[in-house]
């Protein structure tokens, strides 16, 4: 039976997800172009400090400035127009709007980014540049994969939405690296231990790699934490597609990935996802048990590969 999750009350003034993701996009485009804040400011007709605030989603940006900057960075007009339509008005204040429905959403709390390859590039940039991540995965996620496993799961024959900068995605996203000092907690569904993605040999190597990462965890320094989530109970996160809570420049939002990325902040729905992820973290195996499960599963895969 699915365990119900009660969201906590709101504790912060949320920023609209589209503004947060736009900020990541603007910074990624600027840095890929090799431009300084001052150069971007000249293109936008604003100050360097204003551009910096836009990139950190600390202040609203006008539609005209969005258009000037994105066209300056070489973004196609159809994608520029799409982003301008997605943003809240420059004078939008969430507290002035009533929350609607069971999800308790204000008008711009949820954003489904349906812009195809540009949307996937933005999602990759969000995950790579976040200062903190808490995520639940039914497959080993980006950043933790061996080369052989990555090739298997990103094979176009089986992969609908690539969460790595693969050939065909916009050039700028290939320059985005994982943030230094990122605090990332990955909850892996227990089924990962038994699904031989890429074959037994490939999966055995991947599980060994995960076990080594768990062995190298530094509890004092933070950084990467990997835990196995047992199948002994059905939790709220099991109903979601690649749920994660990420923090970018102090802004917290939840993300999901199905046929396209989605983002949410501020709403009851967003708080419920966050609470569900924390419930899953509490139910996950400890470090030692996670390591034992990974080693045991790797041994099983390797034995089957040799038979």
Segments and roles (model prediction):
Residues 2-24, 32, 38-42, 49, ...:
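Interdomain hinge/linker segments and adjacent boundary elements that couple functional modules
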Residues 35, 46, 224:
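Short glycine/serine/threonine/alanine-rich loop segments
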Residues 199-307:
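C-terminal regulatory/effector modules of DNA-binding transcriptional regulators
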């Amino acid at each position: 039976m699915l365990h119900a999750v009660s969201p906590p009350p709101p504790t912060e003034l949320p920023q609209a997800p589209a503004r947060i993701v736009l900020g990541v996009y603007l910074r990624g485009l600027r840095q890929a172009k090799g431009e300084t804040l001052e150069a971007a400011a000249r293109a936008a007709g604003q100050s360097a400090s204003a551009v910096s605030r836009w990139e950190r989603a600390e202040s609203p940006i006008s539609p005209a400035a969005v258009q000037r900057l994105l066209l300056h960075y070489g973004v196609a007009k159809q994608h520029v127009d799409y982003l301008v339509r997605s943003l809240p008005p420059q004078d939008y204040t969430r507290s002035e709007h009533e929350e609607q429905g069971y999800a308790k959403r204000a008008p711009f709390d949820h954003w489904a980014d349906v812009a195809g390859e540009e949307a996937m590039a933005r999602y990759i940039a969000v995950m790579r540049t976040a200062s903190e991540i808490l995520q639940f995965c039914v497959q080993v996620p980006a950043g933790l994969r061996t080369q052989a496993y990555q090739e298997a799961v990103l094979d176009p024959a089986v992969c609908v939405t690539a969460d790595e900068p693969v050939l065909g995605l916009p050039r700028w996203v290939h320059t985005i690296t994982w943030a230094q000092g990122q605090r990332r907690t990955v909850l892996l569904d227990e089924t990962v231990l038994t699904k031989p993605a890429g074959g037994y040999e490939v999966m055995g190597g991947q599980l060994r790699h995960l076990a080594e990462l768990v062995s190298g965890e530094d509890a004092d320094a933070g950084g990467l934490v990997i835990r196995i989530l047992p199948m002994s109970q059905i939790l709220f996160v099991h109903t979601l597609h690649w749920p994660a809570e990420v923090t970018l420049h102090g802004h917290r939002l939840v993300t999901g990935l199905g046929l396209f990325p989605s983002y949410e902040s501020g709403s009851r729905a967003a708080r419920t996802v966050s609470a569900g992820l924390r419930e899953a973290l509490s139910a996950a195996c400890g470090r030692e048990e996670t390591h034992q499960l990974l080693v045991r599963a790797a041994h099983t895969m390797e034995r089957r590969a040799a038979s």
